Amino acid sequence: MKFNEAPSADGVWHHCHLLPAADPAQAIRDGAIVVEQGRIAWLGAFAALPDVYRHLPRHDANGAWITPGLVDCHTHLVYGGQRADEFAMRLAGASYEEIARAGGGIVSTVRATREADEATLFAQASARLEPLLAEGVTAIEIKSGYGLSLEAERKQLRVARQLGETYGVAVHTTFLGAHALPPEYAGRADAYIELVCETMLPALAAEGLVDAVDAFCEGIGFSIAQTTRVFEAAARHGLPVKLHAEQLSNLGGAALAARHKAISADHLEHLDEAGVVAMAEAGTVAVLLPGAYYFLRDTQLPPLALLRKHGVPMAISTDHNPGTSPTTSLLLMMNMGCTIFRMTVPEVLAGVTTHAARALGAADRHGLLAVDRAADFVLWQVASPAELAYWFGRNPCAAVVRRGRVFRKGEGWQR
């Protein structure tokens, strides 16, 4: 079903329970939502439904819980190919260096992405996006970073925009040119950062393809000084920044991100208290990525106690990518957030709604059920919202409303 052919959600949604935000204390049992012209006009207890809305068409939610649409705030969804062969090599004991020498690793994805045309990239990314939409995702971040040339990065970002237009999902694009060194710049990292800052970013920003700028600040990525150059270039174009930080080591990337008022710092397994304090003071969201932690069989947990102590908002995301987190299930990430990272159910609910929206700089658009917001919400056939994190391998989503259009399970609802 094409997005513009899906039925309208306008009318009164009733026979439901509402969770307007992640806090269970705000739940409304026997609630109702009124949608007019694709936006939420009213919500509350059904018994308090104003008379002015009682004549509108009714949508029976069949006892479902309704939450805000989910937000997947860190993905690398658009790329060529996949790396299952590399996964098998790793399981057989091959090191990262051995895989790279055999032509694997990120270079293989860069090669496949550069070789693919936009139609191919769109078809492959669509197959990854649709399972996320089927789990209630209504807003998603999509990074570039597998092109590593102006032409190929542009191609990734154009496809990301096309996905949003085709599926009616809110796509937030992030330019991640500073993801890795392309083969042609081996040993010349500073020269490549010059290209990123002075050629790629200005051109892509001028074309309206960039909503935010990211970098990979690690020993195997880019240094603090090089990342600083990327952030300064983003500032010249009025773009917010975010950062892959402290995943493999503590270089002080989170503190750097905070100094530049980054909207998020992501991964953070090796984050220390100084970095946590800096993030808290800057209002930077901690985006936790249990899929990559699991897939890499990591043992260093993010410092949850410190993040809680200093009041840093925590988001959860799939980090969908071919090398370290080839998952298309945000619900599974919620379960892993609880079982592996030891988060609470309210924390993971906030992590895929309100806090994930903050991590995109879009808290005014996503992550809450509120009057005057777009009608983006999900119907779940569960007895309690806790079931969203409890189950794994099961999708209890019955229907999704995206931009005021209804997509029901079993009716070609993903598209």
From Swiss-Prot:
Source organism phylogeny: Bacteria, Pseudomonadati, Pseudomonadota, Betaproteobacteria, Burkholderiales
Family: Belongs to the metallo-dependent hydrolases superfamily. HutI family.
Biological process according to GO: L-histidine catabolic process to glutamate and formamide; L-histidine catabolic process to glutamate and formate
Function noted in UniProt: Catalyzes the hydrolytic cleavage of the carbon-nitrogen bond in imidazolone-5-propanoate to yield N-formimidoyl-L-glutamate. It is the third step in the universal histidine degradation pathway.
Protein name: Imidazolonepropionase
NCBIfam families per the UniProt record, alphabetical: hutI (TIGR01224)
Domain of life: Bacteria
Gene Ontology, cellular component aspect: cytoplasm
Binding residues annotated for 4-imidazolone-5-propanoate, in chain numbering: 83, 146, 179, 247, 324
Binding site for N-formimidoyl-L-glutamate: 146, 321, 323
Organism, scientific name: Cupriavidus metallidurans (strain ATCC 43123 / DSM 2839 / NBRC 102507 / CH34) (Ralstonia metallidurans)
Requisite cofactors: Zn(2+); Fe(3+)
Reactions performed catalytically: 4-imidazolone-5-propanoate + H2O = N-formimidoyl-L-glutamate
Keywords: Cytoplasm, Histidine metabolism, Hydrolase, Iron, Metal-binding, Zinc
Record text on cofactor binding: Binds 1 zinc or iron ion per subunit.
Residue numbers binding Zn(2+): 74, 76, 244, 319
Subcellular location: Cytoplasm
Primary residence: cytoplasm
GO molecular function: imidazolonepropionase activity; iron ion binding; zinc ion binding
Binding residue positions for Fe(3+): 74, 76, 244, 319
Pathway, per record: Amino-acid degradation; L-histidine degradation into L-glutamate; N-formimidoyl-L-glutamate from L-histidine: step 3/3
EC number: 3.5.2.7
SUPFAM superfamilies tied to this protein: Composite domain of metallo-dependent hydrolases, Metallo-dependent hydrolases
